């Protein structure tokens, strides 16, 4: 079953732009945060779809399980990922030949924790060691803070190349200074 999103719904704020200054910061630091990326209407619509998905799959659903909404026939999700502004961001990072390789909807219920160890996404998606460039993005549909799941990044670590998990785990605290961003629903985190 395909669930439609209103085609006239404004998805992305008009103010969103990934210009030269944003690109320069991204290249240097390995991430960029866009406040209020999604419109309030898109957040509300997305939440209603997310609530429906969780309710439909509640039987046997673990509180922190990931799902791939684009593979569930969720057109609203596909519409966000293929919005021209999102594609422009990805094209500036990767070039014109783009593939939506992987997408997750992660449900974190109140009181149900799920830690994710430090890692490089390239290790998961590039098993053939091709070193294909990646552009990751994360859009929370709820406000997040240090108590319920911020995204933590290690600035400039993308310049270290592909590291073994043992190297990442062994890095001392001084070398592994992270940026833990508090985010509002609808913000956009782009990272390498």
Question: What are these regions, as identified by a protein language model?
Answer:
Residues 107, 139-140, 153:
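Hydrophobic side chains in beta-strands
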Residues 13, 22, 59-63, 132, ...:
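Catalytic cores of transferase enzymes with a strong primary signal for eukaryotic protein kinases
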Residues 93, 119, 126-146, 182:
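Short, conserved beta-strand element in jelly-roll/cupin
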Residues 6, 147-192:
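Double-stranded beta-helix
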Residues 1-29, 34-129, 166:
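Non-heme Fe(II)-dependent double-stranded beta-helix
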């Amino acid at each position: 079953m395909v669930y439609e999103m209103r085609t006239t719904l404004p998805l992305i704020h008009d103010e969103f732009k990934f210009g030269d200054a944003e690109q320069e910061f991204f290249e240097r630091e390995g991430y960029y945060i866009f406040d209020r990326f999604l419109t309030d209407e898109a957040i509300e619509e997305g939440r209603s779809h997310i609530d429906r998905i969780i309710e439909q799959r509640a039987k046997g659903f673990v509180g922190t399980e990931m799902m791939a909404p684009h593979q569930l026939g969720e057109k609203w999700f596909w519409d966000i990922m293929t919005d021209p502004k999102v594609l422009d961001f990805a094209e500036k990072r990767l070039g014109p030949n783009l593939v939506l390789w992987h997408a997750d909807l992660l449900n974190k219920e109140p009181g149900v924790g799920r830690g994710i160890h430090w890692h490089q996404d390239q290790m998961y998606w590039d098993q053939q060691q091709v070193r294909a460039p990646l552009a990751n993005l994360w859009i929370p549909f709820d406000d997040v803070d240090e108590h319920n799941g911020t995204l933590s990044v290690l600035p400039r670590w993308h310049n270290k190349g592909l590291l073994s998990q043992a190297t990442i785990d062994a890095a001392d605290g001084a070398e592994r200074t992270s940026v833990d961003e508090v985010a509002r629903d609808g913000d956009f985190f782009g990272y390498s």
